[in-house]
Amino acid sequence: ESQMEQKNIEVQRKKGLNLMMKILITAIIPLLILVTFAGLAIRAVGVSVSDKLMQHELKTSIYAVNQTLSVISSGDWNVDGDQLYKGDYNISEHQDVLDAFKENTGLDVTLSWNTTRMATSLVRQDGSRETGTEIAADVYQTVKEKGSYFVSDNVIDGQKYYGYYEGLYNSDGSMAGLVFTGMASASVHEIYNDRLKKNIIFMVVLAIFACMFL
């Protein structure tokens, strides 16, 4: 009789465990599906928000660049050969100003005369500066007509960039060239994916805790 009772207890215990597993599985699967869809939704919305935030940050950084250049010299933009000047100040000889801006903000800066890059913190794979190359004519035209241009997939020397362009203007209102600020898309995506990963981990942990208290 004692053995029979023990078997019954064991059977009931197994039934209880099986029931608990069924409850957990029934609860966990929908939660995992919910977490997956929530993660995809966050990613979709996040990409859009990321673009808008980058556009705002790059636009703000151009204002900072312009203010810095105004302090350096109040003169108009001009060129002498392959040298870019603002007033009497030779920007091409002092590109360390742009390098310092990049070091402090993580953003690259380029100054162009018309569509030709004359001074930049952008460096090619061989270590030389990305000067003497051309900015697309349609970008220049868009800035001339609309005042600015934002792009999330600008390709420079084979690398994609988030970029924002505005005009470089002389005292008479004429547009002498362009000012560009940008960040490599890979760097932006790395920052965004890191935040997304943390959010998903938090949601998974939350789902596990929810299952434990069902």
Protein language model features and the residues they cover:
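Helix-start (N-cap) segments at beta->loop->alpha junctions
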Residues: 158, 169-172, 180-197
